[in-house]
């Protein structure tokens, strides 16, 4: 007989290990916590490691906010070899011995071309769909289709180290950025090709690697310690401004929706009733256009 599953609410930040899929991490965590409902916030490739927030219960309603959040990565690029997938798991499709002589000054000039607003073409080996079919399935069948480019933003691109045939970079970027595509494009710009050989996500939205748990750590915890590892829903929005409801605004917010003119507010805000976080709201030029209600104090609900 199966144990009754717990209706947990909140987020557990996982430090994903290499060679495990994001979905397998999700299923293992759901089993470890005996959770009724869980979902992740965007996949990491099996070869990638690092920050993978897992949402439980009511927190799954705000998973999209983490999907849309900025990310930070540490990436290592191998030069002189191209693969069909753009990473070390793919088949080699080209080799070059014409790797230029690298220097910090030269690489900084090259990397500067990829900072700011960038137009990027996602790789064929991705979960994006073409006529309803995931691109990676078409790629595995040997098919190639024209993939639409997308506008992304790279806020920070820092050279960490390099040697004669590789470089390591730190990338802070917007949603929708493919680090494999960045590795491919950097290799092309250097004139020798390249592919991604290591990737670690160090931050996803407000969640940093330093606060993430390895699955092995969680397996050794008591039930109480596991529950303590769940961070509340407000933590997802900890960098967002707070709007405290006035007494006369409460009925409008809870019943009809608050449409008051708030010219100083734009984007996502945290709504407080007295001293308690009760909702998130989207303001567009001071007008409330969307809201979601929470009771962040309830980690385990009926």
From Swiss-Prot:
Catalytic activity: uridine(55) in tRNA = pseudouridine(55) in tRNA
The UniProt record lists the keyword Glycosyltransferase: no
EC number(s) per entry: 5.4.99.25
GO process annotations (BP): mRNA pseudouridine synthesis; tRNA pseudouridine synthesis
Superkingdom, taxonomy of origin: Bacteria
Pfam families membership: TruB_C_2, TruB_N
Annotated GO MF terms: RNA binding; tRNA pseudouridine(55) synthase activity
Alphabetical UniProt keywords: Isomerase, tRNA processing
Cited CDD domains: PseudoU_synth_EcTruB (cd02573)
InterPro entries (UniProt xref): PsdUridine_synth_cat_dom_sf, PsdUridine_synth_N, tRNA_psdUridine_synth_TruB, TruB_C
Active-site residues annotated for this sequence: 45
Function: Responsible for synthesis of pseudouridine from uracil-55 in the psi GC loop of transfer RNAs.
HAMAP family, per database record: TruB_bact (MF_01080)
Stated family: Belongs to the pseudouridine synthase TruB family. Type 1 subfamily.
Designated name of the protein: tRNA pseudouridine synthase B
Organism placement in taxonomy: Bacteria, Pseudomonadati, Pseudomonadota, Gammaproteobacteria, Thiotrichales
Gene name of the encoded protein: truB
